[in-house]
């Protein structure tokens, strides 16, 4: 009771990708709705910090069903990021660190495809800082094509956050290397979340 929950939501350009029934952005918004529903009531409050890279939306923590519904609607209506606009999950988390907030729950919703500084993800330090005052959950949002490439012959791969494109031939070797790199990245994300004291859920 009287739990304060904060959603840290990454809606950068890489989330505007999807090859399944919905894109990753839609999965992220569904995760927002689920957390808001599960944590409301009993004097609990929920708020959010959402960023596309170009625009940041801050929604104060409040209680009640009307607030939860309005919050999810505002997140869903946030304009999509422009191609070439980089996201910054670390900046979202820093926003939650300062000023210090009452002890509660922080739920981070992202595909965790952000940049690294050496072997460390740039979002690790601010997330570790949040762990001193909050319980943490990381919700990793994935598309099947984040994990493996289909056999499609010649395709153009694009990075939505830089705008860079590259034409490749999806040979068996390339597909194996892509799958191995994707699996290694997911293992690194899981290890980083554990180091920060965060539980992990995966949506795909």
What is the meaning of each model-derived region?
Residues 1-33, 37-204:
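Exposed, interaction-prone extracellular/peripheral surfaces
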């Amino acid at each position: 009771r009287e739990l304060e929950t904060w959603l840290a939501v990454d809606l950068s350009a890489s989330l505007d990708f999807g090859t399944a029934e919905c894109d990753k952005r839609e999965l992220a918004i569904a995760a927002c709705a689920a957390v808001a529903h599960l944590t409301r009531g009993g004097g609990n409050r929920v708020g959010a910090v959402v960023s596309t890279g170009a625009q940041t939306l801050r929604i104060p923590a409040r209680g009640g069903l009307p607030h939860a519904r309005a919050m999810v609607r505002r997140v869903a209506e946030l304009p999509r990021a422009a191609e070439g606009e980089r996201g910054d999950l670390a900046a979202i988390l820093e926003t939650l660190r300062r000023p210090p907030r009452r002890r509660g729950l922080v739920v981070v919703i992202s595909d965790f495809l952000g940049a690294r500084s050496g072997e460390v993800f740039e979002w690790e330090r601010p997330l570790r800082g949040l762990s001193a005052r909050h319980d943490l959950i990381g919700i990793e949002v994935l598309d099947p094509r984040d994990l493996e490439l289909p056999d499609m012959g010649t395709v153009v791969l694009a990075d939505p956050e830089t705008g860079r494109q590259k034409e490749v031939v999806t040979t068996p070797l390339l597909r194996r290397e892509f799958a191995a790199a994707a699996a290694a990245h997911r293992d690194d994300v899981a290890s980083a979340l554990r180091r920060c004291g965060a539980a992990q859920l995966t949506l795909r």
